[in-house]
Amino acid sequence: MQNITQSWFVQGMIKATTDAWLKGWDERNGGNLTLRLDDADIAPYHGNFHAQPRYIPLSQPMPLLANTPFIVTGSGKFFRNVQLDPAANLGVVKVDSDGAGYHILWGLTNEAVPTSELPAHFLSHCERIKATNGKDRVIMHCHATNLIALTYVLENDTAVFTRQLWEGSTECLVVFPDGVGILPWMVPGTDEIGQATAQEMQKHSLVLWPFHGVFSSGPTLDETFGLIDTAEKSAQVLVKGYSMGGMKQTISREELIALGQRFGVTPLASALAL
C-alpha cells in the first residue's frame, strides 16, 4: 500500500507550510492553505483513507465544487507542526455530489476539522476556477508582516496600494499585473468575508485583508507562495523607504508601461493612471 504522506500533494503542503512559518507569516495557528486535487491524485491512496469518513455540511452549497477533492490545513493547527505530524494537521476532503458538504477522507485525526476560513477558500476556488478556466488550484492565506503594516499607513484602495507595490520592486508589475484587491476590515471566519474575498478574486489573484493578512491564488503551491513572497518583498522595501524619510525617486508611469510591454502583461488600468 502506498503511503499518502509521501504523495506529491502532502509533501507539497509540508514544504509550503514550513516555508511560510519560517518566513514569519504564520504565527501560532495563523494562516490556512487549500489545494484542489483530482480523483487521479488520491486514487492510489484509498488504503490510507478513514474507514468511516466524517461528513461535514457546508454553510452554503457550492455545486461547482461537487465531487472535488482537496487537501486542506486544519482549524487551530500550527503551520510549524505540519512537518512533524501531517495526519494531525492536514486533511484530504472530498465535496459530495451536490456540493452541500464534504467527507474527511484522510487526516485531521482526533476529530479535527478543516480551517475556519474554509468558506472563504471554497468561494475563492469557485471564482478562480471561472476566472482562469480551471488553471488556479491553490488558495493561501497568511499574515505577511510588511503587507499588514502597510494597511495601517497607505490608503486602503486597490489602485493606490497596487501602484505603491509596483513601484516598490520592479518584478511586481510582471508578477501581479492584475493588482491587489482590498477589503474593508471584516470579522474573519464568516461567510461574509468569504463572499467579499471571492468577489475580489474575480479580478485579482492577490487580496488584502487590512490589519490581518493576505489571500493569494495560483496554479501551484510554488506559484501561490511566490506571489505573496513577491508582494511582501516590495512591502518590506516600502516600509524601509518610509522609515528612512520617504522616497526621493521611484519607477515612473512611463517605465511601468514599458515594463508591461516588455513582458507582455496588461497592468491594472486604475493603478497605472495614478
Swiss-Prot record:
GO BP: any one term: pentose catabolic process
InterPro entries in alphabetical order: Aldolase_class_II_sugar_metab, Aldolase_II/adducin_N, Aldolase_II/adducin_N_sf, Rhamnulose-1-P_Aldolase
Entry's EC annotation: 4.1.2.19
Record: active site: E117
CDD domains reported in the protein's UniProt record: Aldolase_II
One matching Pfam family: Aldolase_II
Assigned keywords, A-Z: Cytoplasm, Lyase, Metal-binding, Rhamnose metabolism, Zinc
Major location (coarse): cytoplasm
Biological pathway: Carbohydrate degradation; L-rhamnose degradation; glycerone phosphate from L-rhamnose: step 3/3
GO MF annotation list: metal ion binding; rhamnulose-1-phosphate aldolase activity
Catalytic activity: L-rhamnulose 1-phosphate = (S)-lactaldehyde + dihydroxyacetone phosphate
Disulfide bonds: none
Cofactor: record remark: Binds 1 zinc ion per subunit.
Annotated Gene Ontology cellular component terms: cytosol
SUPFAM superfamilies according to UniProt: AraD/HMP-PK domain-like (SSF53639)
Binding site for Zn(2+): H141, H143, H212
Cell compartments where the protein resides: Cytoplasm
Function: Catalyzes the reversible cleavage of L-rhamnulose-1-phosphate to dihydroxyacetone phosphate (DHAP) and L-lactaldehyde.
Similarity section: Belongs to the aldolase class II family. RhaD subfamily.
Alphabetical list of PANTHER family matching this protein: FUCULOSE PHOSPHATE ALDOLASE, RHAMNULOSE-1-PHOSPHATE ALDOLASE
Protein name: Rhamnulose-1-phosphate aldolase
Organism in which the protein naturally occurs: Escherichia coli O7:K1 (strain IAI39 / ExPEC)
